[in-house]
From Swiss-Prot:
Additional remarks: Present with 155 molecules/cell in log phase SD medium.
Entry superkingdom: Eukaryota
Effect of W1158S: Abolishes interaction with LAS17 and causes severe mislocalization of the protein
GO cellular component, one term: actin cytoskeleton
Record protein name field: Myosin-3
Compositionally biased intervals (Pro residues): 1109-1118
Organism phylogeny: Eukaryota, Fungi, Dikarya, Ascomycota, Saccharomycotina
Basic residues bias: start-end ranges: 980-1000
Cystine pairings recorded for this chain: none
SMART domains: MYSc, SH3
Compositionally biased residues, Low complexity: 1066-1078
Gene: MYO3
Length: 1272
């Protein structure tokens, strides 16, 4: 039969919002790439160099270039644009830890910026790898991310960010060049510090330059290029520059054309020139400064075109003086003095402390060419230093710097066919960086574990400190110190200095990382063995410009040229000036010191091939890099170590919010030992013990997941606190809204009445005195709500049916029911249907199951105006025939528990419809063929239904046709009363799931006591319909009139019975056994899940039971310690293990009564305990105190005479009368007994329940304010 799933709803009642704490709905990520290989090498099943190389190769072939080793990023140069640096990709990494997103350089940048903000510590990233592995690109992407992540609307902050980004194209133009291995190889070292203010916005910056490869200015090996700026300038110079500085194409200059390569495949020099000019303007270089920079570049190019010939004396002579004249014009010096400085060398002798003679020594063409190149290199080197200093001046324009993020972009390890002084300096710096990596990761980590007494298995690794000492040591002297001594010994002759250096190298033969081979020597670097040439190495180490060239520059009238060169040389100074080796050692040590003051991050870059091909992967080359970078040792230490360590003090300062014992409302409240605070934090954050260790001064967290969990909880702390305040405030506002709605509804009902109740009364008048009534239709809460399937709402079953059928009009009435379906030669069938009524149309909707899904189809679409008549029987059945006007289809014969409401609404929509009530229903079974259905009374019919067979309806006797509906009970609390609420649980977890249907279901499984939902007065009609159309299985038991339990009525709702009535009560109660055989069989299932009633007890009219005396409530008696009760009816139970099945007459102990109408009972022998309906139990009385049976004869006679008349009344009333601890008996209108009839029993029982709930709710309301702030 039809099931009412949802009761009537008010428009102002909204579905509760879903709580954000719930698991989000899973969605398919179409953009997520399939995982290739392993994203973190610490997860490798087998740790070896080969397995690492194989994993990197697999990912490289699939376009994935980034892989982790813990927090260290491995980057393989793809030699192509993968489209992974867009703004969309950048945004996806904001606020994410590295486990939430794929490996990426943006993840390293996000981690650095997050740690800067969270721990207020300087950060740096060390990018290492050989030349062409992608170090410069990684540095650019980190700068890109930090500039984007540090959003600020301040104009000054935005200007600084633009300046920082502009340093990339500017310094790349002047410091990078195309080599055989890399089209954009850094030929200098750069450490960029981005400084942040207290709001962690970039406010300043500083660039430190390391060892520019100035030799590249004057010469390159075949197929390499000079610095980018020379090709940009010569190809993209404006006409003004071409006219002022005589700029030609790069093929016209020796310095740019000698190597035979003036173009590169991936480089657009003209476009890059425009980018360089834009970067200059962004940084703040004015036009005059730009002009002077390009004037110096033009001078360098023209200096390279100065050629020398040998004169008659074998000395050098300038081949074309027009070139020297133009160079003198550009440098703004005297042309003759320039030529003299190029072809002659000034030497000065000394005698002790006295100045000696001065000699002008002529130079041969080779020597003159060397002097020319020295002048060009000196101008470019000093120009580059000036540009770096000028950038720093612009970046320091805004004060307020507090912390910084450093980005180290330095030349990679180099091994060429011929390696000289430049390579030994570059490789030395890379050795120092490797030493930092070892000290800060491998060595320092193990030393920390040992110092902190952490359980640890030592890992062997190679410490390259011995190689660094071999190069930089002072005592005993290293290679660079030996080179300085050779220069001091033979400073005038480069060849003699080289020979002296070769002799001193014999001192290192005992070192296992050094080998001497004729005019070469080998250093066994961490990245491999490198052979260096001795010839000319000492001259490069001098790094000195001839004094006559310095004096020449001192005579210039160009203030810019004077600015970029140092002060005049102190001719009287006897102190040896620092060599290039001294400078690089000093710079490297300063760099190490700077990096050691910051929290480091690491990016290890790998070059997959030497051909710069995006498809080639050289296993041998990559495997070599994997070995010398020490990736295997890094993986082993990472797997055995801890992802995070912090001192107790800083850990508590960071995470004390996570422990209620350490904090309150954001304040640190713990005054005990710091170690105890650490333990409390870890305990309250529920970090497993295996995930951390406590050392002597620090706490160690093993996995990144645990650290991220701590960080996530801390980030959400303030959100959770704000959410608590918001929930409390919203709850307060909702109470005010509910109270206002309640007041408004009450006022409206007092002024104009309830429209739903008015409609019910109108329908009752239409059938007044014509049709027997059902018990549920007499309830005071029964109102004609109309849309019982909630078709007008969204996301309901009714709206789903409405959409399937295609109903667009507003639904006036909807209900489930049945329709009689006739078949030729077979009995008619009762098929389930859905009835939907709009203002114009009445729909009868059929349902079928197809492919395990319910499908709804339109059986009837009846125009309300074409309904001629509605035919009903005069009994209490639910059948009605809808007679149509001149219809070509049969008239529907339908069955619905809300037939009266349907008939009433049809009548309201069409006043012409006739209502016919009689012993039969006449309808057209087929067009123009009238068919008659009869109705008969049968005791064998279902209690809440009927039987249809052979055109006859069999139904039980109903209430008299003139029975009146009960009035709607009044609100017991009045306008000032608070809403009745069920007692709130103090436990936090139960409060979280208050509105969850699943949680209710789970709680029902765990809670043995059946619970009841708070009543909604407007939904009682739906509940009545559900009970009417879904009766519980009938189990008939014999019942006597005297066995009806007495009602426990509150004293303020009852009055004392008269003395005559007391006597009648005694007689009626004593007739319990003698009258049992003469009673009918009625069913008494337990009353579960019935809604609460807030209305006071009322009396109703029941003419069939007017003169039957009913026992009043027994007088109150003292409760024994273990009171005995007797089962008045059979209680078979529903099968739940928490219930105690009983048979009539069983005696049990009652230890606990619940307001919901259940009692906890235990057998007399104590063998079993469970819940039973309170209404089924009566106090047990000893037979010695029972009134003699003979005294009750008169009562039995009366009962027997009237039993046939009140049979239906009792059977229907007993289903609804037993609620809570209140039971009532039937009375008539003229009876003085204050106890109500069975038809009024539901209201009476719910009234008693409501009284008790009001008292409980008052206690709840007193404590409710205190619970608000404890709501998580």
């Amino acid at each position: 039969m039809a099931v009412i799933k949802k009761g009537a709803r008010r428009k102002d009642v909204k579905e509760p919002k879903k709580r954000s704490a719930k698991i989000k709905k899973a969605t398919f990520d179409a953009n997520k790439k399939k995982e290739v290989g392993i994203s973190d090498l610490t997860l490798l099943s087998k740790i070896s160099d080969e397995s690492i190389n194989e994993n990197l190769k697999k990912r490289f072939k699939n376009g994935i270039i980034y892989t982790y080793i813990g927090h260290v990023l491995i980057s393989v140069n793809p030699f192509r644009d993968l489209g992974i640096y867009t703004n969309a990709v950048l945004e996806s990494y904001k606020g994410k830890n590295r486990l939430e997103v794929p490996p990426h350089v943006f993840a390293i940048a996000e981690s650095m910026y997050y740690n800067l903000k969270s721990y207020n510590e300087n950060q740096c990233v060390i990018i290492s790898g050989e030349s062409g592995a992608g170090k410069t690109e990684a540095a650019k992407r980190i700068m890109q991310y930090i500039a984007a992540a540090s959003n600020s609307h301040s104009e000054s902050i935005g200007k600084i960010k633009d300046m920082v980004l502009a340093t990339n194209p500017l310094l790349e133009s002047f410091g990078c060049a195309k080599t055989l291995r890399n089209n954009n190889s850094s030929r200098h070292g750069k450490y960029l510090e981005i400084k942040f203010n207290s709001q962690f916005e970039p406010c300043a910056g500083n660039i430190t330059n390391y060892l520019l490869e100035k030799q590249r200015v004057v010469g390159q090996i075949k197929n390499e290029r000079n610095f980018h700026i020379f090709y940009q300038f010569t190809k993209g110079a404006s006409d003004t520059y071409k006219q002022m500085f005589g700029v030609q194409m790069p093929e016209q200059y020796i310095y740019t054309a000698a190597a035979g390569c003036t173009t590169a495949d991936t480089i657009d020099d003209v476009k890059d020139y425009e980018g360089t000019l834009e970067a200059m303007r962004t940084i703040g270089l004015v036009q005059e400064e730009q002009d002077q920079i390009f004037r110096m570049l033009a001078a360098i190019l023209w200096i390279g075109n100065i050629s020398f010939i040998e004169n008659e004396e074998g000395n050098a002579q300038v081949g074309d003086t027009s070139v020297t004249d133009f160079v003198a014009y550009l440098l703004q010096v005297d042309a003759s003095l320039l030529v003299k400085c190029l072809v002659e060398r000034i030497m000065q002798t000394s005698h002790g402390m006295k100045r000696g003679s001065v000699y002008h020594v002529p130079l041969n063409p080779v020597q003159a060419t060397a002097v020319r190149d020295a002048l060009a290199k000196a101008i470019y080197n000093n120009l580059f230093d000036w540009i770096v200093d000028r950038v720093n001046v612009s970046l320091q324009a805004f004060p307020g710097a507090d912390k910084s993020i450093g980005i180290l972009d330095i030349y990679g390890f180099e091994i060429f066919e011929h390696n000289s002084f430049e390579q030994i300096c570059i490789n030395y710096v890379n050795e120092k960086l490797q030493q930092i990596f070892i000290q800060l990761t491998l060595k320092a980590e193990q030393e920390t574990y040992e110092r902190e007494k952490i359980k640890w298995t030592p890992i062997k690794y190679f410490d390259n400190k011995v190689v660094c000492d071999l190069i930089e040591a002072k005592n005993p002297p290293g290679i660079l110190a030996a080179m300085n001594d050779s220069i001091a010994t033979a400073h005038a002759d480069s060849n003699a200095a080289d020979q002296a250096f070769a002799q001193r190298l014999n001192l290192f033969n005992s070192n296992p990382y050094f080998e001497l081979r004729a005019n070469k020597f080998v250093i066994k670097h961490y990245a491999g063995d490198v052979t260096y040439d001795i010839n000319g190495i000492t001259d490069k180490n001098k790094d000195q410009l001839q004094k006559d060239l310095i004096e020449l520059i001192g005579t210039t009238t160009n203030t810019f040229l004077s600015t970029i060169f140092p002060d005049d040389v102190d001719k009287d100074s006897k102190r040896r000036p620092p060599t290039a080796g001294d400078k690089i050692i000093k710079s490297a040590n300063e760099l190490v010191e700077t990096l050691s003051k910051a929290e480091p991050s690491y990016i290890r870059t790998i070059k997959p091939n030497q051909t710069k091909s995006p498809n080639d992967y050289d296993d041998h080359q990559v495997l070599h890099q994997v070995k010398y970078l020490g990736l295997q040792e890094n993986v082993r230490i990472r797997r055995a170590g801890f992802a995070y360590r912090q001192t107790f003090e800083k850990f508590v300062e960071r995470f004390y919010l996570l422990s209620p014992d350490c904090s309150y409302a954001g304040d640190y409240t713990w005054d005990g030992d710091t170690l105890e605070a650490v333990k409390l934090i870890l305990r309250d954050a529920m970090i497993p013990e295996k995930e951390f260790q406590l050392g002597v001064t620090s706490v160690f967290i093993k996995t990144p997941e645990s650290l991220f969990a701590l960080e996530d909880m801390r980030d959400k702390y303030w959100y959770n606190m704000a959410a608590r305040i918001q929930r409390a405030w919203r709850r307060f506002l909702q109470r005010r809204i509910d109270a206002a709605i309640k007041i408004q509804r009450t006022i409206r009902e007092k002024k104009g009445g309830n429209k739903y109740v008015k409609l019910r009364d109108y329908g009752t008048k239409l059938l007044a005195g014509k049709k027997e009534r059902r018990s549920m239709s007499l309830l005071g809460y029964r109102a004609f709500m109309g849309d019982y399937l909630s078709c007008n709402e969204s996301k309901t079953k009714g709206s789903y049916i409405r959409r399937q059928v295609g109903i667009k009009d507003k639904v006036v009435f909807s209900i489930k029911g049945e329709c009689l379906h006739s078949k030729f030669g077979r009995s008619a069938q009762r098929l389930k249907k859905v009835f939907i009524l709009t203002k114009k149309t009445f729909y009868i909707i059929g349902q079928t199951r197809e492919q395990n899904a319910m499908k709804y189809t339109q059986d009837y679409k009846i125009d309300v105006g074409k309904i001629k008549q509605v035919s009903l029987t005069n009994l209490q059945d639910d059948w009605m025939g809808v007679i149509l006007v001149n219809s070509t289809q049969s008239d529907p014969l339908i069955n619905t528990p809300f037939k009266t409401e349907l008939m009433t609404r049809l009548k309201k929509l069409n006043e012409k419809i006739m209502i016919k009530v009689g012993p039969t229903i006449e309808y057209h079974k087929q067009p123009n063929k009238l068919h008659t259905v009869r109705s008969k009374i049968s005791d064998s019919a279902p209690k809440y239904g009927d039987i249809y067979k052979s055109s006859t309806i069999y139904v039980r006797r109903g209430h008299p046709a003139n029975s009146k509906s009960n009035k709607k009970p009044k609100n017991p609390g009045g306008l000032s009363g608070k809403p009745i609420k069920s007692k709130k649980s103090k436990h936090k977890s139960t409060h979280k799931h208050t509105h969850s249907h699943r949680s209710h279901r789970d709680a029902a499984k765990k809670q043995p006591l059946p619970s009841q939902k708070p009543v909604n007065p407007l939904s009682l009609a739906a509940t009545a319909a559900q009970a009417a159309y879904n009766p519980k299985p009938d189990k008939t038991v014999p019942i006597k009139s005297s066995a009806i339990p007495a009602a426990k009525v509150s004293s303020k709702h009852s009055s004392k019975p008269s003395s005559k009535e007391k006597v009648a009560v005694k007689k009626a109660s004593s007739s319990h056994k003698s009258s049992s055989a003469k009673q009918n069989q009625v069913s008494m299932p337990p009353s579960k899940g019935v809604e609460k009633n807030k209305e006071p007890l009322k009396e109703t009219t029941a003419t069939a039971t007017a003169n039957i005396p009913i026992p009043p409530p027994p007088p109150p008696m003292g409760q024994p310690k273990d009171p005995k009760f007797e089962a008045a009816y059979d209680f078979p139970g529903s099968g739940s293990s928490s219930e105690l099945p009983l048979k009539k007459g069983d005696i049990v102990f009652i230890s606990r009564d619940e307001p919901s109408g259940w009692s906890l009972a235990k057998l007399l022998d104590g063998s079993k305990e469970g819940w039973v309906p309170t209404a089924y139990m009566t106090p047990y009385k000893d037979t010695r105190n029972t009134v003699p049976v003979a005294a009750t004869g008169a009562v039995n006679d009366v009962t027997n005479q009237k039993s046939s008349q009140i049979d239906n009344t009792i059977s229907s009333a007993q289903e609804g009368v037993q609620f809570g601890s209140a039971t009532v008996g039937p009375t008539s209108d003229n009876q003085s007994n204050p106890v109500g009839t069975f038809s009024d029993g539901l209201a009476s029982a719910l009234a008693a329940r409501a009284n008790k709930m009001r008292a409980e709710s008052a206690d709840d309301d007193d404590n409710d304010d205190g619970d608000d702030d404890d709501d998580w």
